[in-house]
Amino acid sequence: MGSPFAKKEDRPDINDEQKGMKKKVAIQGIAGSYHDVAAQRYFEGEAVEPVPCDTFREVIEHVSAGTVGMMAIENTIAGSLLQNHELIREGNCRIVGEYKLRIMHSFAALPGTRAEDITEVNSHPIALMQCRDFLDTLPGAKLVECDDTAGSARWVAEKQMHGHGVICARRAAEMYGLEVLAEGVETNKRNYTRFLVIARPDLAEHMQQEAVRNKASLVFALPHTSGSLSKVLTILSFYDMNLSKIQSLPIIGREWEYMFYVNLTFEDYTRYRQALEAIIPLTNDLKTLGEYEQGKQSI
């Protein structure tokens, strides 16, 4: 069964990106968001035009129609975005790359605003949570949750909200004309988000013709037999696969059954393919979500 997200007639030509246009990248949020920052870093040297989306499902819809997507998959503090694993699988998307972005939050407001003038701070709830120690130094400020860090910055700027501060990326503050009052206000300085670059299968093949492949993302179910997961892991170990992540999600409508999302890193692609063949008889619904180069981590 094909992807439920796209109609064939809506799909652009595979060579559209080669005609001198900006590279369009679908992101959750707007320009200046951390998804936008990750896209700009990953495609450094290319002209990137973010395609704003309200939801991650909307990102998948754009990817199914032929646009490259950038999607957060896990954060070192907040953990995994579980629904995004399922969206990638259900949308029949392919992972073609990843980028690990250090999340450095800035505190910004309208130009000329002083920190003591702030009566309300607006941002995404996770950003507010990650800056709690800094926000405690503003005891008179009310914290108000919003859908997007960059959206908060744009709203304060466009509505000229005096007395409002925002937690956002420096890129968002500069883009919308706010003044950065403090930088690096996150409590934990080892705050990273891993973003996946995703594409429609035919575009993924085109993008990866000469790509280095030393990481793979797989998903599979297992039979209800004793030691079924242990057997799979033993085989992966035998073929020198490094299991960098394993995540289980319940299968809706099938009580106590799970899909396992696995990330593997490896040095020998041939050994990886042999490992994949070896676990096929032990798994159900095995699917490769992507084979790609292990991502760099920003400083």
Question: Each PLM stretch: what is its role?
Answer:
Residues 1-299:
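Domain-level signature for soluble enzymes in the chorismate/prephenate branch of the shikimate pathway
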